Amino acid sequence: NVRLARPEASDDEVRAALDSAHLGAWIDALPRGMATMIGEGSAHVSGGERARIAVARALLADQPVLVLDEPTAHLDADTARRVSDEVLSEERGRSIVWITHGTIGLDAMDTVIRLEG
């Protein structure tokens, strides 16, 4: 599922993206680890796991611009902070657009644009 972002990625690269999204322990607990099929539309995962899978895909794609829409939605505050810290540490010269209703992660941004209405 995560490898869809970059089919030629090695298992180590996929695992690094999963770890950055704080999914490593969850993956390890699955019956077949990274080879476990999780179902169409991610029907067998929680909202938080689904959000972190999307983050892992985005990190694995390794594009120059990373657009994350509510990347920490459905996560508890501690996990949201850890995921945001990890994503922002993976910046590697790319631009990150972080769309959020919350404030977690905004303190690390170079520029914050607030829309009200």
Question: Where in the sequence are the language-model features?
Answer:
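Conserved catalytic segment of ABC-fold P-loop ATPases
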Residues: 107-114
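Helical segment within the ABC ATPase nucleotide-binding domain
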Residues: 80-92, 104
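Conserved H-loop
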Residues: 93-101
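Hydrophobic anchor residue at the start of the ABC signature
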Residues: 55
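A short, proline-enriched helix->beta-strand linker immediately N-terminal to the Walker B motif
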Residues: 60-64
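ABC ATPase nucleotide-binding domain helical subdomain, centered on the C-loop/LSGGQ "ABC signature"
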Residues: 1-40, 84-85, 93
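Catalytic Walker B motif of ABC-type/P-loop ATPase nucleotide-binding domains
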Residues: 66-70
